[in-house]
A protein has these predicted regions:
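Bacterial N-terminal signal peptides
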Residues: 10-23
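Metal-dependent amide/peptide-bond hydrolase catalytic core
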Residues: 27-28, 202-212, 216-460, 466-476
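Acidic/His- and Gly-rich active-site-bordering loop/insert found
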Residues: 28-137, 144, 154-163, 343
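Short pre-catalytic strand/loop immediately N-terminal to key active-site residues, enriched for Gly-Thr
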Residues: 128-139, 407-408, 448-450
Protein backbone atom coordinates (compact mmCIF):
# COMPACT_ATOMS: atom_id res chain seq x y z
CA UNK A 1 0.00 0.00 0.00
CA UNK A 2 2.90 2.32 0.83
CA UNK A 3 4.60 1.50 -2.49
CA UNK A 4 1.41 2.17 -4.42
CA UNK A 5 1.29 5.67 -2.92
CA UNK A 6 4.95 6.39 -3.59
CA UNK A 7 4.86 5.58 -7.25
CA UNK A 8 2.19 8.11 -8.23
CA UNK A 9 3.82 10.77 -6.04
CA UNK A 10 7.25 10.20 -7.56
CA UNK A 11 5.74 10.18 -11.00
CA UNK A 12 3.97 13.50 -10.39
CA UNK A 13 7.13 15.10 -9.01
CA UNK A 14 9.15 13.96 -12.01
CA UNK A 15 6.44 15.11 -14.37
CA UNK A 16 6.33 18.51 -12.72
CA UNK A 17 10.10 18.86 -12.83
CA UNK A 18 10.22 17.76 -16.45
CA UNK A 19 7.51 20.19 -17.43
CA UNK A 20 9.20 23.04 -15.58
CA UNK A 21 12.53 22.22 -17.19
CA UNK A 22 10.95 22.03 -20.62
CA UNK A 23 9.39 25.41 -20.06
CA UNK A 24 12.79 26.82 -19.18
CA UNK A 25 14.32 25.25 -22.26
CA UNK A 26 11.66 26.71 -24.53
CA UNK A 27 11.76 30.17 -22.98
CA UNK A 28 14.47 32.64 -23.95
CA UNK A 29 16.20 34.43 -21.05
CA UNK A 30 15.18 38.05 -20.37
CA UNK A 31 16.81 40.58 -22.67
CA UNK A 32 19.95 42.17 -21.23
CA UNK A 33 19.29 45.73 -22.36
CA UNK A 34 22.74 46.97 -21.37
CA UNK A 35 24.30 44.48 -23.76
CA UNK A 36 21.73 45.48 -26.40
CA UNK A 37 22.79 49.12 -26.02
CA UNK A 38 26.43 48.19 -26.60
CA UNK A 39 25.53 46.13 -29.67
CA UNK A 40 23.17 48.80 -31.02
CA UNK A 41 25.87 51.45 -30.77
CA UNK A 42 28.33 49.16 -32.56
CA UNK A 43 25.97 48.68 -35.51
CA UNK A 44 24.86 52.33 -35.49
CA UNK A 45 28.42 53.63 -35.71
CA UNK A 46 29.28 51.07 -38.36
CA UNK A 47 26.51 52.16 -40.74
CA UNK A 48 27.19 55.84 -40.03
CA UNK A 49 30.80 55.40 -41.12
CA UNK A 50 29.79 54.32 -44.61
CA UNK A 51 29.61 57.40 -46.87
CA UNK A 52 26.26 56.88 -48.56
CA UNK A 53 25.73 60.48 -49.69
CA UNK A 54 23.14 60.62 -52.45
CA UNK A 55 24.21 61.39 -55.10
CA UNK A 56 25.87 59.04 -55.81
CA UNK A 57 24.43 56.88 -53.02
CA UNK A 58 26.81 53.95 -53.18
CA UNK A 59 24.92 52.02 -50.53
CA UNK A 60 26.74 48.75 -51.30
CA UNK A 61 29.03 48.67 -48.26
CA UNK A 62 26.25 49.53 -45.83
CA UNK A 63 23.96 46.94 -47.44
CA UNK A 64 26.62 44.24 -47.33
CA UNK A 65 27.29 44.99 -43.67
CA UNK A 66 23.59 44.65 -42.80
CA UNK A 67 23.32 41.45 -44.82
CA UNK A 68 26.30 39.97 -43.01
CA UNK A 69 24.90 40.83 -39.57
CA UNK A 70 21.48 39.35 -40.39
CA UNK A 71 22.83 36.18 -41.96
CA UNK A 72 25.20 35.62 -39.06
CA UNK A 73 22.07 35.45 -36.91
CA UNK A 74 20.50 32.89 -39.24
CA UNK A 75 17.98 35.30 -40.77
CA UNK A 76 17.20 34.72 -44.46
CA UNK A 77 18.38 37.75 -46.45
CA UNK A 78 18.23 38.85 -50.10
CA UNK A 79 19.78 41.73 -52.02
CA UNK A 80 18.13 43.55 -54.96
CA UNK A 81 20.08 45.87 -57.25
CA UNK A 82 18.81 47.95 -60.18
CA UNK A 83 22.07 49.85 -60.71
CA UNK A 84 25.64 49.04 -59.64
CA UNK A 85 26.29 49.78 -55.97
CA UNK A 86 22.65 50.75 -55.27
CA UNK A 87 21.63 47.80 -53.11
CA UNK A 88 18.36 47.11 -51.30
CA UNK A 89 18.44 44.53 -48.49
CA UNK A 90 15.39 42.41 -47.62
CA UNK A 91 15.28 39.99 -44.68
CA UNK A 92 12.35 38.00 -43.32
CA UNK A 93 11.38 36.28 -40.09
CA UNK A 94 8.70 33.71 -40.79
CA UNK A 95 5.43 33.73 -38.86
CA UNK A 96 2.47 31.36 -38.83
CA UNK A 97 0.65 33.34 -41.51
CA UNK A 98 -2.41 33.95 -39.32
CA UNK A 99 -1.90 37.65 -39.98
CA UNK A 100 -0.42 39.50 -42.94
CA UNK A 101 3.23 40.66 -42.67
CA UNK A 102 4.68 43.72 -40.98
CA UNK A 103 7.37 45.67 -42.89
CA UNK A 104 10.19 47.56 -41.15
CA UNK A 105 11.70 50.08 -43.57
CA UNK A 106 14.64 52.46 -43.41
CA UNK A 107 16.92 54.03 -46.01
CA UNK A 108 20.68 53.74 -45.98
CA UNK A 109 21.46 56.75 -48.19
CA UNK A 110 21.85 60.29 -46.86
CA UNK A 111 21.96 63.82 -48.22
CA UNK A 112 25.36 65.25 -49.13
CA UNK A 113 27.77 67.04 -46.83
CA UNK A 114 30.23 69.93 -46.85
CA UNK A 115 32.96 68.50 -44.58
CA UNK A 116 34.45 71.95 -43.99
CA UNK A 117 31.34 72.98 -42.06
CA UNK A 118 31.40 70.04 -39.66
CA UNK A 119 33.04 70.17 -36.23
CA UNK A 120 33.50 66.39 -36.36
CA UNK A 121 34.06 64.52 -39.63
CA UNK A 122 30.57 63.72 -40.96
CA UNK A 123 31.26 60.00 -41.37
CA UNK A 124 33.25 59.47 -38.18
CA UNK A 125 30.26 58.69 -35.92
CA UNK A 126 32.00 60.64 -33.18
CA UNK A 127 30.63 60.24 -29.65
CA UNK A 128 30.94 63.33 -27.47
CA UNK A 129 28.98 64.71 -24.54
CA UNK A 130 26.31 62.04 -24.73
CA UNK A 131 25.68 62.60 -28.45
CA UNK A 132 26.63 60.75 -31.61
CA UNK A 133 27.51 63.13 -34.46
CA UNK A 134 27.33 62.24 -38.13
CA UNK A 135 25.38 62.39 -41.35
CA UNK A 136 22.39 60.08 -41.05
CA UNK A 137 22.14 60.03 -37.25
CA UNK A 138 18.51 61.15 -37.40
CA UNK A 139 17.83 60.59 -41.11
CA UNK A 140 17.66 57.64 -41.37
CA UNK A 141 20.33 55.35 -39.96
CA UNK A 142 18.65 55.56 -36.56
CA UNK A 143 15.60 53.79 -38.02
CA UNK A 144 17.80 51.32 -39.90
CA UNK A 145 19.58 50.43 -36.66
CA UNK A 146 16.35 50.10 -34.68
CA UNK A 147 14.85 47.81 -37.33
CA UNK A 148 18.05 45.74 -37.48
CA UNK A 149 18.11 45.27 -33.70
CA UNK A 150 14.42 44.38 -33.69
CA UNK A 151 15.06 41.60 -36.18
CA UNK A 152 18.01 40.27 -34.17
CA UNK A 153 16.15 40.36 -30.86
CA UNK A 154 13.05 38.68 -32.27
CA UNK A 155 15.20 35.92 -33.73
CA UNK A 156 17.10 35.37 -30.49
CA UNK A 157 13.96 35.40 -28.36
CA UNK A 158 12.41 32.57 -30.33
CA UNK A 159 9.02 34.20 -29.83
CA UNK A 160 6.29 32.62 -31.96
CA UNK A 161 4.99 35.03 -34.61
CA UNK A 162 1.51 35.31 -36.07
CA UNK A 163 2.87 37.31 -39.00
CA UNK A 164 6.07 37.55 -40.99
CA UNK A 165 8.32 40.45 -40.04
CA UNK A 166 10.16 41.90 -43.06
CA UNK A 167 13.22 44.15 -42.94
CA UNK A 168 13.91 46.52 -45.84
CA UNK A 169 17.02 48.70 -45.96
CA UNK A 170 16.44 50.65 -49.15
CA UNK A 171 18.61 52.75 -51.39
CA UNK A 172 17.87 56.09 -52.97
CA UNK A 173 15.31 57.74 -50.70
CA UNK A 174 17.12 61.07 -50.86
CA UNK A 175 16.26 61.76 -54.49
CA UNK A 176 16.89 58.61 -56.53
CA UNK A 177 13.87 56.49 -55.61
CA UNK A 178 13.97 54.68 -58.97
CA UNK A 179 16.78 52.49 -57.57
CA UNK A 180 15.11 52.00 -54.22
CA UNK A 181 11.46 51.95 -53.28
CA UNK A 182 10.17 52.39 -56.85
CA UNK A 183 12.29 49.45 -57.99
CA UNK A 184 11.11 47.31 -55.09
CA UNK A 185 7.44 48.31 -55.36
CA UNK A 186 7.28 47.86 -59.13
CA UNK A 187 9.48 44.80 -59.68
CA UNK A 188 9.79 42.98 -56.35
CA UNK A 189 6.69 43.93 -54.40
CA UNK A 190 6.02 40.33 -53.34
CA UNK A 191 9.23 40.50 -51.30
CA UNK A 192 7.98 43.43 -49.20
CA UNK A 193 4.18 43.13 -49.44
CA UNK A 194 2.71 43.68 -45.98
CA UNK A 195 -0.39 44.82 -44.15
CA UNK A 196 1.49 47.43 -42.14
CA UNK A 197 4.76 49.33 -42.40
CA UNK A 198 6.85 51.16 -39.81
CA UNK A 199 9.32 53.68 -41.23
CA UNK A 200 10.69 57.19 -40.69
CA UNK A 201 8.68 60.40 -40.40
CA UNK A 202 7.71 60.62 -36.74
CA UNK A 203 9.53 61.56 -33.56
CA UNK A 204 9.16 62.37 -29.89
CA UNK A 205 9.40 66.13 -29.51
CA UNK A 206 11.31 67.45 -26.53
CA UNK A 207 11.66 71.06 -25.44
CA UNK A 208 14.16 72.12 -22.79
CA UNK A 209 14.74 68.45 -22.07
CA UNK A 210 11.07 67.62 -21.43
CA UNK A 211 8.89 65.48 -23.69
CA UNK A 212 6.02 67.45 -25.25
CA UNK A 213 4.34 64.80 -27.39
CA UNK A 214 4.99 61.94 -29.79
CA UNK A 215 4.25 62.34 -33.48
CA UNK A 216 3.36 59.48 -35.81
CA UNK A 217 3.43 60.30 -39.52
CA UNK A 218 0.22 59.03 -41.11
CA UNK A 219 0.04 61.27 -44.20
CA UNK A 220 2.26 63.40 -46.38
CA UNK A 221 2.05 66.15 -48.95
CA UNK A 222 2.86 65.45 -52.57
CA UNK A 223 5.89 67.25 -54.10
CA UNK A 224 5.65 68.91 -57.51
CA UNK A 225 7.67 71.53 -59.36
CA UNK A 226 6.28 74.47 -61.33
CA UNK A 227 8.29 76.55 -63.80
CA UNK A 228 7.40 80.18 -64.53
CA UNK A 229 8.93 81.51 -67.74
CA UNK A 230 8.56 85.24 -68.37
CA UNK A 231 9.08 86.64 -71.87
CA UNK A 232 9.88 90.29 -72.49
CA UNK A 233 11.75 92.71 -74.69
CA UNK A 234 15.53 92.67 -74.75
CA UNK A 235 17.34 95.98 -74.69
CA UNK A 236 20.03 98.21 -73.25
CA UNK A 237 20.09 98.47 -69.47
CA UNK A 238 20.38 102.26 -69.66
CA UNK A 239 16.78 102.44 -70.90
CA UNK A 240 14.44 100.65 -68.40
CA UNK A 241 11.50 98.87 -70.01
CA UNK A 242 8.17 97.90 -68.50
CA UNK A 243 8.41 94.74 -70.62
CA UNK A 244 11.60 93.64 -68.81
CA UNK A 245 11.23 89.86 -68.32
CA UNK A 246 12.87 90.01 -64.88
CA UNK A 247 10.43 92.67 -63.74
CA UNK A 248 7.48 90.58 -64.96
CA UNK A 249 8.86 87.48 -63.31
CA UNK A 250 9.51 89.25 -60.01
CA UNK A 251 5.94 90.52 -59.91
CA UNK A 252 4.57 87.06 -60.70
CA UNK A 253 6.74 85.38 -58.07
CA UNK A 254 5.71 87.90 -55.42
CA UNK A 255 2.04 87.44 -56.32
CA UNK A 256 2.05 83.66 -56.28
CA UNK A 257 4.20 83.45 -53.13
CA UNK A 258 1.69 85.49 -51.14
CA UNK A 259 -1.34 83.64 -52.53
CA UNK A 260 -3.29 81.70 -49.90
CA UNK A 261 -4.76 78.48 -51.27
CA UNK A 262 -7.84 77.26 -49.38
CA UNK A 263 -7.47 75.38 -46.10
CA UNK A 264 -7.93 71.63 -46.57
CA UNK A 265 -8.14 69.22 -43.65
CA UNK A 266 -8.11 65.42 -43.51
CA UNK A 267 -8.45 62.85 -40.72
CA UNK A 268 -4.80 63.25 -39.78
CA UNK A 269 -4.75 67.04 -39.51
CA UNK A 270 -8.13 67.25 -37.77
CA UNK A 271 -6.99 64.77 -35.14
CA UNK A 272 -3.60 66.47 -34.86
CA UNK A 273 -5.06 69.90 -34.05
CA UNK A 274 -7.70 68.40 -31.76
CA UNK A 275 -5.11 66.56 -29.67
CA UNK A 276 -2.61 69.42 -29.78
CA UNK A 277 -5.26 71.79 -28.43
CA UNK A 278 -5.92 69.40 -25.54
CA UNK A 279 -2.30 69.61 -24.30
CA UNK A 280 -1.58 73.29 -25.06
CA UNK A 281 -1.90 76.53 -23.06
CA UNK A 282 -5.27 78.35 -23.53
CA UNK A 283 -4.17 80.95 -26.10
CA UNK A 284 -2.48 78.37 -28.33
CA UNK A 285 -5.29 75.88 -27.85
CA UNK A 286 -7.81 78.47 -29.06
CA UNK A 287 -5.88 78.89 -32.32
CA UNK A 288 -5.62 75.14 -32.85
CA UNK A 289 -9.36 74.73 -32.31
CA UNK A 290 -10.04 77.63 -34.68
CA UNK A 291 -8.28 75.79 -37.51
CA UNK A 292 -10.73 72.89 -37.28
CA UNK A 293 -13.77 74.99 -36.34
CA UNK A 294 -16.64 76.28 -38.46
CA UNK A 295 -15.62 79.95 -38.44
CA UNK A 296 -13.74 80.45 -41.72
CA UNK A 297 -12.34 83.85 -40.72
CA UNK A 298 -11.08 82.57 -37.37
CA UNK A 299 -9.46 79.62 -39.13
CA UNK A 300 -7.75 81.90 -41.65
CA UNK A 301 -6.56 84.24 -38.88
CA UNK A 302 -5.06 81.28 -37.02
CA UNK A 303 -3.29 80.00 -40.13
CA UNK A 304 -1.98 83.51 -40.88
CA UNK A 305 -0.54 83.57 -37.35
CA UNK A 306 1.08 80.17 -37.89
CA UNK A 307 2.61 81.35 -41.18
CA UNK A 308 4.74 83.77 -39.16
CA UNK A 309 5.17 81.94 -35.85
CA UNK A 310 5.00 78.25 -36.85
CA UNK A 311 5.34 77.96 -40.65
CA UNK A 312 5.21 74.16 -40.66
CA UNK A 313 1.70 74.23 -39.16
CA UNK A 314 0.51 76.66 -41.83
CA UNK A 315 1.95 74.43 -44.53
CA UNK A 316 0.20 71.36 -43.11
CA UNK A 317 -3.31 72.67 -43.79
CA UNK A 318 -3.01 73.88 -47.38
CA UNK A 319 -1.13 73.28 -50.60
CA UNK A 320 2.00 75.42 -50.55
CA UNK A 321 4.35 77.24 -52.91
CA UNK A 322 7.95 78.25 -52.23
CA UNK A 323 9.93 80.08 -54.98
CA UNK A 324 13.39 78.56 -54.67
CA UNK A 325 15.29 79.20 -57.94
CA UNK A 326 15.39 82.31 -60.15
CA UNK A 327 17.34 82.47 -63.42
CA UNK A 328 17.63 85.50 -65.68
CA UNK A 329 20.11 87.85 -67.27
CA UNK A 330 23.73 87.38 -68.21
CA UNK A 331 25.33 90.84 -67.88
CA UNK A 332 24.59 94.01 -66.02
CA UNK A 333 23.86 96.28 -69.01
CA UNK A 334 21.55 93.93 -70.93
CA UNK A 335 17.82 93.59 -70.35
CA UNK A 336 17.13 89.86 -70.86
CA UNK A 337 14.28 88.68 -73.04
CA UNK A 338 13.57 85.70 -70.76
CA UNK A 339 13.67 84.90 -67.06
CA UNK A 340 12.61 81.79 -65.14
CA UNK A 341 11.56 80.84 -61.62
CA UNK A 342 11.21 77.37 -60.16
CA UNK A 343 8.55 76.87 -57.51
CA UNK A 344 8.55 74.04 -54.98
CA UNK A 345 4.91 72.98 -54.75
CA UNK A 346 3.58 70.63 -52.05
CA UNK A 347 0.01 69.55 -52.66
CA UNK A 348 -2.40 68.31 -50.04
CA UNK A 349 -3.19 64.69 -50.91
CA UNK A 350 -6.43 64.65 -52.87
CA UNK A 351 -5.78 68.01 -54.55
CA UNK A 352 -6.20 67.79 -58.34
CA UNK A 353 -2.76 68.77 -59.76
CA UNK A 354 -4.11 70.17 -63.03
CA UNK A 355 -6.76 72.20 -61.26
CA UNK A 356 -4.06 73.60 -58.98
CA UNK A 357 -1.83 74.50 -61.95
CA UNK A 358 -4.73 76.34 -63.55
CA UNK A 359 -5.23 78.24 -60.29
CA UNK A 360 -1.57 79.30 -60.39
CA UNK A 361 -2.11 80.59 -63.94
CA UNK A 362 -5.15 82.53 -62.74
CA UNK A 363 -3.21 84.05 -59.85
CA UNK A 364 -0.25 85.03 -62.07
CA UNK A 365 -2.70 86.58 -64.53
CA UNK A 366 -0.11 87.42 -67.19
CA UNK A 367 -0.31 85.88 -70.65
CA UNK A 368 3.38 86.60 -71.24
CA UNK A 369 4.33 84.18 -68.47
CA UNK A 370 4.21 80.47 -69.19
CA UNK A 371 3.21 78.27 -66.23
CA UNK A 372 4.02 74.56 -66.48
CA UNK A 373 5.05 71.48 -64.53
CA UNK A 374 8.71 70.54 -64.52
CA UNK A 375 9.97 66.93 -64.50
CA UNK A 376 10.39 65.75 -60.93
CA UNK A 377 10.46 62.59 -58.86
CA UNK A 378 6.77 62.86 -57.97
CA UNK A 379 5.52 60.45 -55.34
CA UNK A 380 1.96 59.17 -55.73
CA UNK A 381 -0.93 60.87 -53.95
CA UNK A 382 -2.31 58.58 -51.27
CA UNK A 383 -4.89 58.68 -48.46
CA UNK A 384 -3.94 58.97 -44.80
CA UNK A 385 -3.17 55.84 -42.82
CA UNK A 386 -5.99 54.76 -40.54
CA UNK A 387 -6.03 56.04 -36.99
CA UNK A 388 -8.19 53.17 -35.70
CA UNK A 389 -5.79 50.42 -36.79
CA UNK A 390 -4.06 47.82 -34.64
CA UNK A 391 -0.72 49.52 -35.28
CA UNK A 392 -1.82 52.97 -34.16
CA UNK A 393 -3.30 51.54 -30.95
CA UNK A 394 -0.10 49.63 -30.17
CA UNK A 395 1.95 52.76 -30.87
CA UNK A 396 -0.22 54.81 -28.51
CA UNK A 397 0.26 52.23 -25.77
CA UNK A 398 4.03 52.03 -26.31
CA UNK A 399 4.51 55.81 -26.34
CA UNK A 400 2.56 56.06 -23.09
CA UNK A 401 4.67 53.29 -21.55
CA UNK A 402 8.08 54.56 -22.67
CA UNK A 403 7.60 58.32 -22.89
CA UNK A 404 4.45 58.99 -20.83
CA UNK A 405 3.08 61.24 -23.54
CA UNK A 406 0.21 61.80 -25.94
CA UNK A 407 0.40 60.70 -29.57
CA UNK A 408 -0.41 63.10 -32.39
CA UNK A 409 -0.84 61.84 -35.97
CA UNK A 410 0.96 64.17 -38.35
CA UNK A 411 1.02 64.99 -42.03
CA UNK A 412 4.56 65.48 -43.24
CA UNK A 413 5.11 68.60 -45.33
CA UNK A 414 8.05 66.75 -46.87
CA UNK A 415 7.98 63.44 -48.71
CA UNK A 416 8.87 59.90 -47.70
CA UNK A 417 8.99 56.58 -49.51
CA UNK A 418 5.92 55.42 -47.61
CA UNK A 419 3.90 57.11 -50.37
CA UNK A 420 4.79 54.30 -52.79
CA UNK A 421 3.63 51.69 -50.28
CA UNK A 422 0.43 53.51 -49.36
CA UNK A 423 -0.35 53.61 -53.07
CA UNK A 424 -0.27 49.79 -52.92
CA UNK A 425 -2.78 49.76 -50.08
CA UNK A 426 -0.29 49.35 -47.23
CA UNK A 427 -1.03 51.13 -43.95
CA UNK A 428 2.20 53.01 -43.14
CA UNK A 429 3.24 54.80 -39.96
CA UNK A 430 6.31 56.97 -39.44
CA UNK A 431 8.10 56.87 -36.08
CA UNK A 432 11.41 58.05 -34.72
CA UNK A 433 13.47 58.79 -31.61
CA UNK A 434 13.17 61.82 -29.37
CA UNK A 435 14.66 65.03 -30.75
CA UNK A 436 15.08 68.43 -29.14
CA UNK A 437 13.04 71.26 -30.64
CA UNK A 438 16.05 73.51 -30.08
CA UNK A 439 18.38 71.34 -32.18
CA UNK A 440 16.99 72.28 -35.59
CA UNK A 441 17.46 76.06 -35.30
CA UNK A 442 20.92 75.47 -33.83
CA UNK A 443 21.99 73.39 -36.83
CA UNK A 444 21.95 69.97 -35.16
CA UNK A 445 18.93 68.48 -36.94
CA UNK A 446 18.41 66.31 -40.01
CA UNK A 447 20.30 67.52 -43.12
CA UNK A 448 22.22 70.04 -40.98
CA UNK A 449 25.97 70.50 -40.73
CA UNK A 450 26.16 69.08 -37.18
CA UNK A 451 23.53 66.33 -37.36
CA UNK A 452 23.39 64.43 -34.08
CA UNK A 453 21.36 62.22 -31.75
CA UNK A 454 21.39 61.69 -28.00
CA UNK A 455 22.78 58.25 -27.19
CA UNK A 456 20.13 57.70 -24.51
CA UNK A 457 17.35 58.48 -26.98
CA UNK A 458 18.75 56.10 -29.59
CA UNK A 459 18.75 53.31 -27.01
CA UNK A 460 15.26 54.19 -25.83
CA UNK A 461 14.00 54.14 -29.40
CA UNK A 462 15.54 50.73 -30.09
CA UNK A 463 13.71 49.25 -27.11
CA UNK A 464 10.47 51.03 -28.04
CA UNK A 465 10.74 49.80 -31.63
CA UNK A 466 11.35 46.20 -30.58
CA UNK A 467 8.41 46.15 -28.18
CA UNK A 468 6.03 47.66 -30.74
CA UNK A 469 6.98 45.05 -33.35
CA UNK A 470 6.88 42.23 -30.79
CA UNK A 471 3.39 43.23 -29.66
CA UNK A 472 2.15 43.47 -33.25
CA UNK A 473 3.69 40.22 -34.49
CA UNK A 474 3.80 37.68 -31.67
CA UNK A 475 1.34 34.83 -31.53
CA UNK A 476 -1.73 35.56 -29.43
Amino acid sequence: MTNNHRRPLSFLVLLALFGFGAALVGQAPPIDWQRVETESMEHFQAVLRFDTSDPPGNERQAAEYLKQVLEREGIATKVFELEPNRLNVVARLQGSGRKRPLLLMGHTDTVNVDPAKWTYPPFSATRNGGYVYGRGTVDDKDNVTAALMTMLLLKRSGVALDRDVIFLAEAGEEGTTRVGIQFMAQQHFAEIDAEYCLAEGGSVLRSEGRVQYASVQTAEKIPHGVLLTASGTAGHGSVPLETNSILKLAQAVATVATWKPPIQLNDTTRTYFTRLAAISPPAEAARYRAVIGNDAKAAQDAVDYFAKAKPSLASSVRSSISPNIIQGGYRVNVIPSEAKATLDVRLISGQDPEAFLNEVRRVVNDSSIRVEWIPRDVRPATPSARLDSEVFKVLESAFARHYDTAVLPTMSTGATDMAYLRAKGMQCYGVGPAVDAEDGPKGFGAHSDQERILETELHKFVRFHYEVVRDLARAQ
